[in-house]
Amino acid sequence: LNYYGPLPNCDLLRRYGYTSAKHSRYDVVEVPWDIIASTIDKRYTGKKGVLDEEEMEEGFVLERDSGEPDDTGINTHPAKFVAFPEELEEQVCQVIGPAMSVDMNRGPNKAQRKQLKLAYYEIMDAVIPARLAQYGTTVEQDEQLLKNPDLEGRHRMAVFVRLGEKKLLKEAKEFIPAQLEKYKPAQEEEEGRSAKRQKR
């Protein structure tokens, strides 16, 4: 890394007019709340929680866990996407809780927490493709563009930044299946629910 420190490529380009493959590990991407809210509205038609406009976040930044550099300033920690922002989960659950009959003022019980987690990751599983769809190109198209020797200067760097954002979104998408598996109801719970429904 240079003396500018661990900056994502979008900041490097904006501040200093260049990009670097070494900084790709620090890349970030913003997910606007309106995409998330739209996804929630499609899935939940019941009464949803209302957010305080002054406290709600209008967008959330996704980033990798990049670790800290060692004493020599070199970072050998593998950069990896390991979590969505906590504030994002809180805001989503605040909205979907009432639609799932969860009293968010009292707080969810253990079973409800699990249900909320599952619903949250199902929402994010739909949000990421929606965010990717906002770009005019795919990862593969950007990679092809960067192979073109005629693509120069700031245009090339802008494509490089855009590609870095998409790669991070794809990593976030790949992180989700394990979370869905972790929070999905056990088979016995499902069978118990279906037995209760049949009794009714």
Predicted regions and their residues:
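Charged low-complexity "KEKE/polyampholyte" interaction tracts
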Residues: 9-11, 15-200
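Short, charged beta-turn/beta-strand-edge "cap" motif at the junction between a beta-strand
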Residues: 1-11
